[in-house]
Structures are given as C-alpha cells and as structure tokens.
Swiss-Prot record:
Alphabetic keyword roster: Cell membrane, Glycoprotein, Membrane, Transmembrane, Transmembrane helix
Ranges of Polar residues composition bias in the record: 158-167
Principal cellular location given in the protein's record: membrane
Phenotype upon loss of function: Leads to a severe growth defect in copper deficiency conditions, but does not significantly affect melanin production, nor fungal virulence. However, when both CTR1 and CTR4 are disrupted, the colonization in the brain and subsequent virulence are significantly reduced.
Protein topology in the membrane: Multi-pass membrane protein
Protein name (Swiss-Prot/TrEMBL): CUF1-dependent copper transporter 1
GO cellular component: plasma membrane
Assembly and interaction partners: Interacts with the copper acquisition factor BIM1.
Segments traversing the membrane: 42-62, 251-271
Induction section of the entry: Expression is induced by copper deficiency and regulated by the CUF1 copper-dependent transcription factor. The CTR1 promoter harbors the Cu-responsive element (CuRE), which is critical for CUF1 binding and activation under copper-limiting conditions.
Annotated stretches, region: Disordered: 106-125, 154-180
Length: 288
C-alpha cells in the first residue's frame, strides 16, 4: 500500500484547513494574515498595512474618475464624434443637433426685489410674443405658430418611410437660404414642432412598439432605428473602457470580501473623495 499518496493528501487537507482558519469571515482589524489578490501580497506589519490602505484609496479615486470619463465619452459618442467631451463651466453649450448657444451672464437678485422685477427678468415666450403681420386694412393680428396635430404625425409615419425630422430640416435650410431663417416666427414654429414631436414620442404615439425608456433616448435624426451603426473608433474604445471598469470593480469587491476594516475604510473614503472631485463632470448625461 502506497503511504506517500496518503501523506500528500493529508498535507493538502491540512493546508486547506489552515488557510480556511486564517481567513476571518467577519469584520476584523488585525494586522497581518489577510491576502490582497495574490499569495505573496500579505502585509504583516503596520507600515505595510498603511501602504496598502493608501494604494486602495488611490484606486478607489481612480475608479470614480473612470466613471466620469465614461460619461464624457458617452456624451461625444451620442453625437457621433470620436473621443470625449471636455468639461467646461462657461462658453457656448453644444447640443446634439450641432447648434451652439451662449449662456447669458448670471443675474443676481436682491432679496427685497419685487415680483415685477423678477417677471421682467424671466419672461417665457407666448403666442403673443411672436412676430406680427399687418393686414391690408392696417390692422395687426398675432401670428399663431403652426403645431402639427397627432393625426398628422400618424399619417406622416404610416404614409411615408422618411422621418418628419428630415422635412423640418429641409424647410429650415430653405428658409435660411432665402433669408427667412432669422425670422423669430419661423424659429418659434420649428421649436414648437420639435416640442410636439417629443411629446408624441413620450406618449407612445410614435414608435409605440418600443419601451418608454428607449423612446426617450432615440436620436431625432434616426427615428426609424433603435441603434446607431457600428464604428471601430467608438465601439472598440467603449468595450475596452467597460472591461477596465469591470476589472477595477471586481478588484475592489475582492478587497471588501476580506472583511478587513482598514481596507474597507480606505475604499469607502476613496470612493467618496473621488465622487466629490469628479462627480460633477458630465453628471447630466449618464449616471452610474
């Protein structure tokens, strides 16, 4: 009977039992005895534990930076651009349609200011604010902006395969070419049509076969499609960035599974500091 095999099995069982006994499955603050990802990474002194805590703190901050960087990349990828959108606190705002609008300087109000002054500062557009046209007899009547009805939207969707967005864009381009593009009445009509289309999409009158969350995220220039075409310069970096985020998430999860209080505190504080530093960048585009 071979006794060497029995001895080897006994040695393996004793090693596994010692390892299971050394792993504490409860919150503890003892120094030494906890493995960090690899068998050789076992801090056994106070200085080594402090170094590990600093490294985990920096890794947690980097994880929140990656989340903010992903939001900046998504903001550019939704516009069909390669790269990422740099954060800025002033200057023109660039929308998905390619237009840019400059922000007015902030207005400071006095606490004792009257309601009349506040109304003068913020005055929303109403149909009476549009341009006025004079009749032959000299009388003046306001021009009511054109808003397409729901039946017109349904007929345009069922009768024609081309999206109504293209027609509105062509009409706007023709108006600009003929010198009418600067007319505030024409701009108001285009804005009113876009708002009516957005409400119809949200109510499910257009693309009713898609979920509500998907209808809200549709690209107005590609209403007939749910997804954008595959691009190597956009989708390959997206996959690599997601893989890096997943790797860091699992590394931090393994750190938390050691139940070491000092390591967990380092990760939690690092995530909080990282969110404080980078959470405001691109937070309006994509959350986490």
């Amino acid at each position: 009977m071979d006794m060497s095999g029995m001895d080897g099995m006994d040695h393996m069982s004793s090693t596994s039992s010692n390892m299971s006994m050394s792993m504490k499955m409860y919150f503890h603050g003892t120094i030494g005895g906890d493995l960090l990802w690899f068998a050789s990474w076992m801090p056994s002194s106070a200085g080594a534990t402090v170094g590990v805590c600093i490294g985990l703190f920096i890794l947690a901050i980097f994880e929140r930076y990656l989340v903010a960087f992903r939001r900046a990349c998504d903001a550019a990828w939704r516009r069909g651009q390669v790269g990422y959108v740099r954060p800025c606190s002033n200057g023109p705002l660039v929308f998905s349609s390619g237009k840019s609008t400059s922000l007015p300087p902030p207005v400071l109000f006095n606490r004792r200011s009257s309601t009349k002054k506040e109304k003068d500062v913020y005055n929303p557009l109403t149909p009476s604010d549009y341009a006025l046209e004079s009749n032959q007899d000299g009388s003046v009547e306001p021009v009511t902006p054109y808003t397409p009805s729901i039946h017109a939207l349904r007929e345009s969707q069922e009768g024609s395969s081309a999206p109504s967005y293209a027609h509105s864009q062509q009409g706007q381009a023709q108006a600009q070419g003929s010198g009418v593009g600067c007319d505030p009445c024409a701009e108001g009509r285009v804005a009113e049509i876009e708002r009516c289309k957005e409400k119809a999409v949200e109510r499910g009158l257009v693309h009713s076969h898609l979920p509500k969350a998907v209808r809200r995220s549709l690209d107005p220039g590609r209403e007939g499609r749910w997804s954008r075409p595959f691009r190597l310069a956009v989708d390959v970096p997206r996959g690599l960035l997601q893989a890096l985020q997943t790797l860091i998430h699992y590394l931090l999860m393994l750190v938390v599974m050691t139940f070491n209080i000092w390591w967990m505190i380092s990760v939690v504080i690092g995530c909080g500091v990282g969110e404080m530093l980078f959470g405001r960048f691109g937070s309006s585009h994509v959350g986490h």
